[in-house]
C-alpha cells in the first residue's frame, strides 16, 4: 500500500481508483483476478491468463514479455528519518551513515547502483526499514514518497518524518501480454483522459504527506523580526 492491496478478496488502493476510472472511461467491466503477490500477477499476464497488469516498473529485459503503457504514476524518492533529525538538502550528507532499503526491489537496486559508496542495509519490507530508523539501527530509509508517506501516516506518526528527497523517480506503468499491443494502446488513451485533479484525488485519498523543509518555524520568526526591525529603522530615517 498505498498503491494496491487485497483485503477480503477485494482490490483496494490508488491503482484500484485508476482501474475504476478506466472502466468508466472505456465503458467496460473489468474483472479483478486475486493473486498472492505481484510476481504471480506478473506471471499470469506473461502467460496470458490475465489481460492487464496494473503496475510494473519498466526494465529492458521485460520488453519481449509485455507491452508497456506510458508511465502513469510518477513519484520522487524521499528520505525518511527520525523527527529530531534536520532537513537533508543533499544526499551526499548521508555518505557516512547507514541507510535502509527494501530487499529485492528493482528500485532499491537502482539506488544502490547510483550511490555505490553509500552504506546501505537491506530489510524485508518498508515497515522493517522504518522500524530500523525508529530504533536507531540506521539513520534513514529511502523509498518513494507515496509508500513512505502511507507507512508513516499509519504506523509512525509523530516518530518519523520525510526529511528530504533524491534525484530519482518511481515511474510505474501498466502492462499487457506481448501479443496484445492493441490493448496497451487503448489503456494509454484511457490513462491520458484522467486529469491532474483526479490523479491528486486518488493519491490524497490514501496518503497524507507532511514534508519537512529547511525553513522551520524558528527561522521564519527570526526573518519576520528582522524585517520588522528594518521597517522601523527606515520609518525613523525617512519620517
Locate predicted features.
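Carboxylate-rich, polar loop motifs that coordinate divalent cations or form catalytic acidic clusters
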Residues: 86, 125-129, 141-150, 178, ...
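Short beta-strand->loop
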Residues: 66-74, 78, 121, 157-168, ...
Amino acid at each position: 500500500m498505498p498503491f494496491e492491496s487485497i483485503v477480503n478478496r477485494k482490490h483496494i488502493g490508488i491503482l484500484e481508483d485508476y482501474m475504476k476510472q478506466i472502466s468508466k472511461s472505456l465503458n467496460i467491466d473489468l474483472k479483478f483476478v486475486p493473486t498472492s503477490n505481484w510476481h504471480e500477477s506478473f506471471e499470469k499476464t506473461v502467460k496470458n491468463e490475465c489481460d492487464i497488469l496494473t503496475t510494473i516498473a519498466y526494465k529492458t529485459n521485460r520488453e519481449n514479455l509485455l507491452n508497456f503503457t506510458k508511465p502513469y504514476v510518477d513519484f520522487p524518492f524521499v528520505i525518511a528519518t527520525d523527527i529530531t533529525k534536520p532537513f537533508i538538502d543533499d544526499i551526499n550528507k548521508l555518505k557516512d551513515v547507514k541507510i535502509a532499503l527494501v530487499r529485492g526491489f528493482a528500485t532499491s537496486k537502482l539506488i544502490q547502483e547510483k550511490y555505490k559508496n553509500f552504506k546501505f542495509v537491506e530489510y524485508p519490507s518498508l515497515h522493517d526499514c522504518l522500524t530500523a530508523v525508529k530504533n536507531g539501527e540506521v539513520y534513514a530509509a529511502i523509498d518513494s514518497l507515496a509508500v513512505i508517506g502511507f507507512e508513516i501516516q499509519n504506523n509512525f506518526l509523530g516518530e518519523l518524518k520525510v526529511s528530504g528527497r533524491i534525484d530519482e523517480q518511481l515511474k510505474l506503468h501498466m502492462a499487457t501480454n506481448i501479443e496484445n499491443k492493441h490493448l496497451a494502446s487503448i489503456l494509454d488513451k484511457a490513462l491520458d483522459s484522467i486529469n491532474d485533479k483526479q490523479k491528486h484525488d486518488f493519491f490524497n485519498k490514501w496518503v497524507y504527506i507532511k514534508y519537512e523543509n529547511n525553513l522551520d518555524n524558528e527561522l521564519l520568526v527570526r526573518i519576520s523580526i528582522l524585517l520588522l526591525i528594518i521597517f522601523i529603522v527606515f520609518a525613523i530615517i525617512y519620517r
